[in-house]
Amino acid sequence: MSFNNVSPGKDIPNDFNVIIEIPAQSDPVKYEADKETGLLHVDRFVGTGMRYPANYGFIPQTLAGDGDPVDVLVVTPFPLVHGCVVRCRTLGMLKMTDESGQDAKLVAVPVNKLSPATAHMTDLSDIGQNLLDQIKHFFEQYKALEPGKWVKVEGWGGIEEAHKEIVDGVANYKK
């Protein structure tokens, strides 16, 4: 099924869909979903051997500054499976740039109805400094051994900035 058939969400930017490409703590393989067919393709093997610190995916029918859909890390009590759709709400974002342009990573949790374990989380501070440090370190280093690739982490952004990223991503997709 084409991911173009999956809506960006019920109440953008407060309640949005994320399609999971990489489960939390899975083997260091970067998967990319083909947006037309819905199939997952191996994009590359992560040379640093690092594991994604949270589930990683994208908001369908969005377009971010790097020309890809808006990226999202989804913090959950258990890893999710490749290709599943999970309704989320954002806590903030990691602002960064890479060789393709602006490449922000939203940090989100499932909507409260889906996960009582994360319902108390209202901003980035609620996921804990250790996980924030792991996320930042992962994205600073995961491309370190790949020729021609680089990442510059610019810091954290709050919910308002993350909401703007989502709204802009939906608008860019519709252009």
UniProtKB/Swiss-Prot annotation:
PANTHER family: INORGANIC PYROPHOSPHATASE (PTHR10286). This is Inorganic pyrophosphatase. It comes from Ralstonia nicotianae (strain ATCC BAA-1114 / GMI1000) (Ralstonia solanacearum). Catalyzes the hydrolysis of inorganic pyrophosphate (PPi) forming two phosphate ions. Its cofactor is Mg(2+). SUPFAM superfamilies: Inorganic pyrophosphatase. GO terms for molecular function: inorganic diphosphate phosphatase activity; magnesium ion binding. Homohexamer. Substrate binds at K30, R44, Y56, Y142. Its EC number is 3.6.1.1. Keywords: Cytoplasm, Hydrolase, Magnesium, Metal-binding. It is an enzyme of class 3 (hydrolase). One of its GO terms (cellular component) is cytoplasm. Mg(2+) 1 binds at D66, D71, D103. Belongs to the PPase family. Its main location: cytoplasm. InterPro entries: Pyrophosphatase (IPR008162), Pyrophosphatase_sf (IPR036649). Disulfide bonds: none annotated. It catalyses: diphosphate + H2O = 2 phosphate + H(+). The keyword Hydrolase applies. GO terms for biological process: phosphate-containing compound metabolic process. It is found in: Cytoplasm. Mg(2+) 2 binds at D71. It holds the Pfam family Pyrophosphatase. CDD domains: pyrophosphatase (cd00412).
